[in-house]
């Protein structure tokens, strides 16, 4: 019986997703969603990663093989060997490498030591634009033998094509999708506010973003501080994990600002959470004030919940928010503009309702996960 089960498993297409960090950022969220929804009668998924050894509970709950490969040096050749061994031992048919670093480390095991299909997914223009010198030369050589290249937006795809001189038949755009069925409009936000220890009449802002400098939480906190001086019922929920040993000290900076501004009881750090769909139902407005983004999944999830959204006018975010339709775009670090945008929505419930309805419509129309899943499964075959 065990022998027959093993034979049945071997007939499946073994897919190895390679990510850099074990966190719940955009690329990791995409991999998590893909694994949850892949046709398990056809595909058997695996995951490998390089940083943050302890797997997230979300990935443990997937019940798939997980492989932590510690990357010690800037160019750690041992990672290539370990990945190659994983590919061989698990009879991996397809490797989906997310981000350029994962591509570099996956290529040896895929194309030189084994004969696996290699698919490279890139999530941001700015990461591609940062590749230069010898690494640009290396990338062009590797991608010549890579089976398919995916950009998560048309802008990322064009950037990849221009940077690496890729032929059109090798590259495609697969927009990151959101499983909209997990998110629904809260017809009674009060019950969710109470669930998370808030008052019924609190007006709640929220951000879902890991505690990294690029996510620019301090910008939002400064605007929130000004608004609190005029409205004591305002609360801010900050959902996202910090990281031990973060060289930028992002979480410490955020905590210090909250303390120095006297916001301990109104700006609440909730950490990394698995109940984001319910937390979003407690919000009145969703904000994302990043310095740069790929395609922000948390923003799309907020839209699927039917929330009005405010974000910085930077790549990634500007592709999702339609100004004066489902929310507002504000210039990076322009505190007064952010305050004004928030005030206009805080003071106008009908406008919040209008923007929220359009948010939900856009999420279903442009970012339904079914389209994303179908295209990836087609590539994996």
Please provide the spans of the model-predicted regions.
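N-terminal strand-loop element at the rim of the active site
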Residues: 12-13, 17-81, 86, 156-157, ...
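A conserved mid-protein helix/loop that constitutes part of the nucleotide-sugar donor-binding site
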Residues: 25-33, 203, 207, 212-226, ...
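Short hydrophobic beta-strand element within catalytic cores of glycosyltransferases
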Residues: 48-49, 308-311, 321
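Short His-centered aromatic/hydrophobic patch
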Residues: 97-103, 122
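A short, well-ordered alpha-helix in the C-terminal region of glycosyltransferases
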Residues: 194, 337, 344, 351-366, ...
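Nucleotide-activated donor-binding/catalytic signature segment of Leloir-type glycosyltransferases, i.e.
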Residues: 251-271
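Aromatic "clamp/platform" in nucleotide-sugar-dependent glycosyltransferases that forms part
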Residues: 272, 291
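Conserved acidic donor-binding segment of nucleotide-sugar-dependent glycosyltransferases
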Residues: 323-324, 328-335, 344-350
């Amino acid at each position: 019986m065990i022998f027959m089960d093993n034979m049945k498993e071997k007939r499946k297409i073994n897919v190895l997703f390679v990510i850099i960090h074990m966190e719940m950022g955009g690329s990791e969220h995409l991999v998590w969603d893909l694994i949850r929804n892949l046709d398990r009668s056809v595909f058997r998924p695996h995951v490998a990663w390089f940083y943050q050894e302890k797997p997230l509970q979300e990935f443990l709950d997937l019940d798939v093989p997980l492989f932590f490969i510690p990357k010690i040096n800037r160019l750690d050749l041992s990672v290539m060997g370990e990945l190659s061994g994983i590919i061989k031992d698990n009879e991996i048919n397809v490797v989906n490498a997310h981000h350029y670093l994962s591509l570099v480390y996956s290529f040896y095991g895929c194309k030189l030591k084994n004969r696996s299909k290699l698919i490279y997914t890139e999530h941001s223009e700015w990461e591609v634009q940062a590749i230069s010198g010898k690494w640009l030369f290396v990338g062009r050589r590797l991608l010549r033998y890579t089976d398919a290249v995916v950009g998560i937006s048309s802008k990322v795809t064009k950037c990849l094509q221009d940077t690496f001189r890729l032929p059109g038949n090798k590259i495609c755009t697969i927009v990151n999708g959101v499983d909209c069925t997990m998110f629904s409009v809260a017809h009674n936000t009060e019950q969710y506010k109470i669930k998370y220890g808030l008052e019924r009449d609190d007006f709640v802002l929220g951000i879902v973003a890991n505690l990294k400098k690029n996510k620019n939480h301090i910008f939002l906190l400064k605007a929130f501080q000004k608004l609190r001086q005029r409205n004591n019922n305002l609360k801010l929920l900050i959902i996202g994990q910090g990281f031990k040993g973060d060289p930028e000290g992002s979480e410490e900076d955020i905590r210090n600002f909250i303390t120095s501004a006297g916001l301990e009881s109104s700006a609440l750090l909730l950490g990394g959470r698995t109940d984001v769909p319910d937390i979003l139902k407690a919000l009145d407005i969703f904000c994302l004030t990043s310095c740069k983004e790929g395609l922000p999944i948390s923003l799309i999830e907020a839209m699927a919940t039917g929330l009005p959204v405010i974000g910085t006018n930077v790549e990634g975010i500007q592709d999702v928010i339609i100004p004066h339709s489902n929310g507002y775009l504000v210039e990076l670090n322009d505190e007064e503009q952010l305050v004004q945008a928030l005030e206009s929505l805080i003071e106008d419930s009908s406008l919040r309702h209008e923007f929220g309805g359009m948010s939900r419509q856009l999420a279903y129309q442009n970012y339904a996960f079914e389209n994303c899943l179908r295209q990836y499964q087609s590539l994996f075959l």
